[in-house]
Amino acid sequence: MIKVISYQSKYKPDFKRLNLEWLDKYNLTESHDLEILDDPQGTVIDRGGCIFLAIEGERVVGTAGLWKENEKEYELIKMTVDPVYRGQGISKILLDRCLTEAGKLKAEKVFLFSNSQLQTALKLYGKYGFCNVEVTDAPFLTADVKMELSLALNQ
């Protein structure tokens, strides 16, 4: 049974391993990624964001988080599922949790940066109502997709 928990430092190696797996696979790893993966507490949580972990037993099988851009906007970050566990709806569980948390934080918008190679993820975001927008202010050189979801009407 999959449960979603808030980030705990004991799972830092799993958070890093799972994210580097997909970043390296698609040759997308950048210094900004490594800053977050090396210090999720300091770079995300202490700045007002959050990270969630999907757990089966004691095994971390997925991650996702919200990076606080400002009081009204959060970036969906580091969403991944262990390849062995893909296709089981874990991404949906993590995305639901992030969007619920964004609502609690009174976010008006959640946005994300991605890469056009990641078609499965992009389709999922589209199903949730994320819309493609012009790529601006991307923290990643490899980000060729930006999507946004307005939450303002849901509050």
Identify the meaning behind each predicted range.
Residues S6-I77, D82-V84, L95-R97, E101, ...:
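Acetyl-CoA-dependent GNAT
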Residues M1-K3:
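Extreme N-terminal starter segment of soluble prokaryotic enzymes
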